[in-house]
């Protein structure tokens, strides 16, 4: 692919903020996004921005008692577009951003900080009930139904006597009908665990030897296809989730990408073979996954096992000197994304030529 044909990653707008920003998410069906974080005085903040004539307009600033670590619209209806957040106090809140004084849902979900959150069943993505999953430093992963107060519908915690590991990332997947749904969780010691929510069992686990920073299925609402896991030592792994071997599990390909921690992975909503990873030194890498000619083969005992594909780097660019801790593609406009970094900046990026790859 010549330089002229390659996608370009362009910083469209950048804005300095007066707080540490941990997460950023597009508001579905709009030119707006939210940023979440904490002020130096120790309180939490949610800001709503809108893109107007090539600039960012602050529409609303909401201050809360506890610093806000993560957020998702994934369990909200397209009509309401409520934001679910996890904070440093272990609280799960759901906010109506039009009237944010009091949360529409509130539960003390965890004993310690909620590091990570994901949603499914809202926004027309995924069959079945709307659900939120949270992962915490307290070692537990909990699934919540916003229509049901107080208690989680599922609680994945270490058995008694087991060490509690810090859960850094969670992701929903396999939500292709009313019954099926999985949660994948990644931990600070390199463990990846796949929980089947239909029969409440641990379906698969592996260890990638370094802390798991980010997990994402290429699509939440299809039969599991691919899972990307990023880690501390600059590596990421792509698992082919179509074929599970009874002892070897899922086939995977590993790529050494950034020179430092790979903080995030996000698949392009309009093409599941393309994904962006963000690095600890402010870099963004755009990748394409290529399937092998055959996705499965039989082993010596006649059992089906998966065959991993390959990844190719389409483009990379450095936009900051600090880790890019959050990234979100616009679900509506191909190639538009928002990212935030620890230099207290939020950036709107445009990735070109994605329709021709």
Curated annotation (Swiss-Prot):
**Cellular-component GO terms for this entry:** dynein axonemal particle; RPAP3/R2TP/prefoldin-like complex
Q: Which Pfam families match?
A: WD40
* PROSITE patterns named in the record: WD_REPEATS_2, WD_REPEATS_REGION
Originating species: Mus musculus (Mouse)
Q: Where are the transmembrane segments?
A: none
Where does it primarily localize?
other
User: What protein does this entry describe?
Assistant: Dynein axonemal assembly factor 10
Q: Where are the WD repeats?
A: 63-105, 115-154, 162-205, 207-249, 257-297, 319-357
Q: Any idea what job this protein has?
A: Key assembly factor specifically required for the stability of axonemal dynein heavy chains in cytoplasm.
Entry's Gene Ontology BP terms: apoptotic process; axonemal dynein complex assembly
Q: What PANTHER family does this protein map onto?
A: MRNA EXPORT FACTOR AND BUB3
UniProt cross-references to SUPFAM superfamilies, sorted A to Z: WD40 repeat-like
Q: Which SMART domains match?
A: WD40
